[in-house]
Amino acid sequence: MNPALQLGIIFAMAIAHSGAQGTVTKSSDHQREVALALEQQGKYAEAETAWRADLKAHPSRPEPYAHLGLLEAQQEHYKEAVPLYRKALALNPNVPALRLNLGLALFKGGELKGALHEFAILLKSAAPDSPEAQRLTILTGMAHYGLTDYAEAVPLLKQAAARDQQNLPLRLALAHSCLWSKQLQCVLDVYHEILTLNSESAEADMLAGEALDEMKDSAGATKMFRAAVQANPKEPNVHFGLGYLLWTQKIYPEAAKEFQAELANDPDHAQSMLYLADANLQMNQPEVALPLLQKVVKLDPSQSLAHLDLGIIYSDSGKNDDAMRELTLAAKLKPDEVNVHWRLGRLYRTLGKKDEAKVEFDKASSLNKAVDEDLLKKMGNTHPRAAETKVPQADPTNP
């Protein structure tokens, strides 16, 4: 699944949902009053029983379906709420706030394409520049964000941010969308807006650093990540980001310290463990690197660099079978990595397998050495969150 839903990326919009102030057609029967009272008391099971009894007595009325959907949504049973809201809409598509509550249930349940459809209908009828239009613009932008349609999210979140000059979470979401859609100047522009709201935002410094790294400004990126570390040394990934930049510049001793600092914050941070091991290997400390690499491949066996480094260590210590296993795995995971084929060629030559060695050396010579993976791609696998926000709740007065 996509980054925004799959990994716990939490959607957040600091927006209060007031909802429309209309009501569904109400009957004055006793059963309905009982159901409403139980619902207001938070007695969900009893309220559901009462609303189902009301539904049985009045099967053509949308109100029982709407309230049953609301009860499910209040218990975070969003997928169960959706068909109930849809049934209510089928009976009366003009019930105030009902379509919005359906859209919110779809959004929170991860059915973002369905949510977009409902938000689009609502946006058409919302008054321009109204609070409702602002709310729907944000929700639409965040739905695109969740679908990884970052380029689609940018203009919507930019429009919403222009209408809310003090909304920091909204600007962080916008900055992430700009970054992941490669609109790098947009990231820097939003970064300066964020600084006016919070001059000590480590996350904003990191975003600016990632953008500068994409723009090949290593010095500027490093400066931004140093500022982020100073602003909040506990910010997830902040030490890894700085360490990785230093590692790309071959400043291995300082890079190792940053990877160690990230591991102090998160002991299972596989990327920091991997690059700490590689930094130690680059500093001729294979005995320090080996246990780290062995742990990395247990945590994440898809890391080609870990297998390459293990292959180097085993090869240098004469453990040729182990070296062959690791280098072969590295070649399968990253077949266009020159160093893997060069190391395999050396190992085959050591084993007296001249033909196999020639094949690997030929592969190495025909490949252009891959450029080091950039910081954005590295951090895309480990970034714990995007902008944190709250999704508006379903309107209990207008289910």
Language model regions located:
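Bacterial N-terminal signal peptides
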Residues: Q6-A16
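Terminal, low-structured helical/coil segments at or just beyond the last alpha-helical repeat
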Residues: T25-D29, W342-P399
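Alpha-helical segment of the N-proximal tetratricopeptide repeat
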Residues: S27-S60, L70, Q74, M142, ...
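Helix-start (N-cap) detector for alpha-helical repeat units in TPR-like alpha-solenoids
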Residues: S28, P62-E63, P96-A97, S130-Q134, ...
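Canonical tetratricopeptide repeat
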Residues: E33, H67, N101, R135-L139, ...
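Position-specific recognition of the canonical hydrophobic site in helix A of tetratricopeptide repeat
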Residues: E39, A66, L70-A73, L100, ...
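Structural signature of tandem alpha-helical TPR/SEL1-like repeats
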Residues: Q40-A53, Q74-K87, G109-I121, G146-Q159, ...
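Structural marker of alpha-solenoid helical repeat scaffolds
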Residues: A57, L91, S125-D129, R163, ...
